[in-house]
Amino acid sequence: MAFLKKSLFLVLFLGLVSLSICEEEKRETEEEEHDQEEDDKSEEKRFLSMIPHIVSGVAALAKHLG
């Protein structure tokens, strides 16, 4: 009977450990996705802020050539 109790406790312990590891990996994955979204947004903002400079450069070039 004691052997069965020890085996049951071991199985429960290993199950809890694996569950904890899975939850930790899930949190890390969610954090990485969140960081990636923030990086994408900042890249988009940088690109959008460059558009007026590009347009004025093209207009100046067209004026110079035209």
Curated annotation (Swiss-Prot):
Similarity comment: family membership: Belongs to the frog skin active peptide (FSAP) family. Phylloseptin subfamily.
UniProt name for this protein: Phylloseptin-S4
Subcellular location field: Secreted; Target cell membrane
Modified residues (Leucine amide): L65
Organism in which the protein naturally occurs: Phyllomedusa sauvagei
Species classification: Eukaryota, Metazoa, Chordata, Craniata, Vertebrata
Biased composition (Acidic residues): 30-41
Propeptide residue range(s): 23-46
Keyword Signal assigned: yes
S-S bonds: none
InterPro entries: Frog_antimicrobial_propeptide (IPR004275), FSAP (IPR016322)
Function according to Swiss-Prot or TrEMBL: Antimicrobial peptide with high activity against Gram-positive bacteria, moderate activity against Gram-negative bacteria, and moderate activity against fungi. Acts by causing bacterial membrane disruption inducing leakage of the intracellular content followed by cell death. It adopts an alpha-helical amphipathic structure in membrane environments. Also shows highly potent antiparasitic activity against Leishmania species. Shows moderate hemolytic activity on human erythrocytes (LC(50)=33 uM). Is also active on human monocytes (IC(50)=23 uM).
GO cellular component: extracellular region; membrane; other organism cell membrane
UniProt-annotated stretches for the region Disordered: 25-44
Keyword annotations from UniProtKB, A to Z: Amidation, Amphibian defense peptide, Antibiotic, Antimicrobial, Cleavage on pair of basic residues, Cytolysis, Fungicide, Hemolysis, Immunity, Innate immunity, Membrane, Secreted, Signal, Target cell membrane, Target membrane
Signal peptide from the UniProt entry: 1-22
Tissue expression profile of the protein: Expressed by the skin glands.
GO biological process: defense response to bacterium; defense response to fungus; innate immune response; killing of cells of another organism
